[in-house]
């Protein structure tokens, strides 16, 4: 009889664990609450022919060659360099802020002064962080840092997180880059690609294995019970000793027994437009008075040729409420929330066959390549733990 495994959630974390266990000979029951696979990577085609990302734009970028090679088993890629503009003082400028942004927003004499001083103070750097500028002893450099902080970061962050910037984790602020040059790429990774047929076919191929049985539109928690006294997981009323791979919310798995983990969510508003293109870049950020944070135009990413048709997406940040209409997107990083997650993590360790992987299970924001890498690592750990169980 084949060894049994259960995977909960079929985004990247769950789908990769399902595939890896299936290839190792496990019979995998993969349960997904949504009506589709792919998690937040899900991509579909609208009536006008434009492929869109249902849960906001996703771009594959990495310095991890092994991650690219792994995903290449399930898709081919085409080169794509992501560029983002921000609307500041009525003008569209590159984000991250760079020398082109400086030239666009300041008089020539002032812009030249800023650029000269930046190159003089950071001669061997192509990127610096906003905190380095704000706290720099040179008043001109600190003044530029304050301008960027106020016009690029403060209001955007307040909208994104629903709180004043003073309450946002300082690690978020410290990571805001400023480019010392005219490089307008949003990412600096060595590999920047998009899947030729979109993201959804990756998951279709990844999950197309005879050892994987998928169930969609099903809440795994209707069939799973936790026996804390016996430290066992029950499935359909019977103890289940095989791996249980959780990529869904860890607080939901434990019935919110320690309270819900807070997230920010997004209200996604798609608009079909009867024009060739709506904006000059795939993403334009709106860091000031608008209620939405950014507008995405997907044709810039998919490279589709559809004259007279395009689709845009406006993202409105909102609070997340468990059981509501909207999905959890961004874990809210602060000591109180992290302590609550650590308590859930301690609870999970009572169950030796329970494995947590992914943004919702680990209460941690992951870039795409990082969650692929993490899922492969957790899969190796599972196979090691169950190596003698054959």
Model region roles, listed by residue range:
Residues 3-30:
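N-terminal Rossmann-like FAD-binding beta1-loop-alpha1 element of flavoenzymes
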Residues 7-8, 31, 238-251:
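Short hydrophobic core segments
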Residues 19, 23, 43, 208, ...:
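Short, well-ordered alpha-helices that flank and scaffold nucleotide-derived cofactor binding pockets
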Residues 22-45:
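Glycine-rich FAD pyrophosphate-binding loop
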Residues 38-40, 86-89, 94-96, 103, ...:
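Short catalytic/ligand-binding loop motif for oxyanion handling, primarily in non-cytosolic enzymes
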Residues 48-121:
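Dinucleotide-binding Rossmann-like beta1-alpha1 core, especially the glycine-rich loop
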Residues 91-93, 100-242:
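Active-site/ligand-binding neighborhood in enzyme catalytic cores
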Residues 242-243, 251-389:
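C-terminal segments that line or cap access tunnels to active or ligand-binding sites in enzymes
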């Amino acid at each position: 009889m084949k060894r049994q495994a259960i995977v909960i959630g079929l985004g990247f974390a769950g789908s990769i664990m399902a595939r890896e266990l299936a290839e190792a000979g496990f019979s995998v029951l993969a349960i997904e609450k949504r009506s589709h696979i792919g998690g937040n990577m899900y991509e579909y085609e609208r009536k006008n022919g434009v492929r869109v990302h249902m849960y906001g734009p996703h771009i594959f970028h990495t310095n991890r060659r092994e991650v690219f090679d792994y995903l290449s088993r399930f898709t081919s890629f085409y080169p794509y360099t992501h560029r983002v503009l921000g609307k500041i003082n009525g003008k569209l400028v590159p984000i991250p802020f760079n020398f082109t942004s400086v030239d666009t927003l300041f008089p020539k004499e002032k812009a030249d002064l800023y650029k000269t001083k930046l190159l003089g103070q950071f001669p061997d750097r192509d990127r610096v962080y906003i905190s380095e500028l704000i706290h720099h002893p040179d008043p001109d450099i600190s003044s530029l840092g304050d301008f960027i902080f106020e016009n690029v970061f403060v209001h955007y962050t307040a909208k994104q997180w629903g709180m004043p910037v003073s309450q946002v984790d300082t690690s978020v602020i410290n990571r805001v880059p400023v480019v010392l040059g005219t490089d307008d790429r949003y990412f600096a990774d060595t590999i920047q690609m998009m899947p030729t047929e979109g993201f959804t076919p990756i998951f279709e191929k990844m999950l197309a294995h005879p050892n994987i049985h998928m169930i969609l539109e099903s809440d795994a928690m209707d069939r799973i019970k936790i026996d804390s006294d016996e430290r066992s997981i029950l499935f359909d009323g019977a103890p289940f000793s095989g791996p249980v791979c959780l990529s869904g919310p860890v607080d939901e798995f434990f019935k919110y027994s320690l309270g819900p983990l807070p997230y920010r969510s997004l209200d996604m508003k798609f608009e079909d437009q009867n024009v060739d293109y709506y904006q000059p870049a795939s993403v334009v950020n709106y860091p000031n008075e608008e209620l939405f944070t950014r507008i995405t135009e997907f044709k810039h990413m998919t490279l589709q040729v559809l004259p007279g048709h395009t689709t845009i997406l406006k993202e409105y940040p909102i609070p997340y409420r468990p059981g509501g209409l909207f999905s959890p997107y961004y874990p809210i990083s602060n000591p109180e929330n992290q302590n609550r997650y650590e308590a859930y993590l301690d609870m999970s360790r009572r169950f030796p066959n329970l494995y947590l992987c992914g943004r919702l299970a680990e209460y941690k924001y992951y870039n795409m390549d990082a969650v692929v890498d993490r899922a492969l690592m957790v899969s190796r750990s599972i196979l090691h733990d169950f190596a003698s169980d054959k």
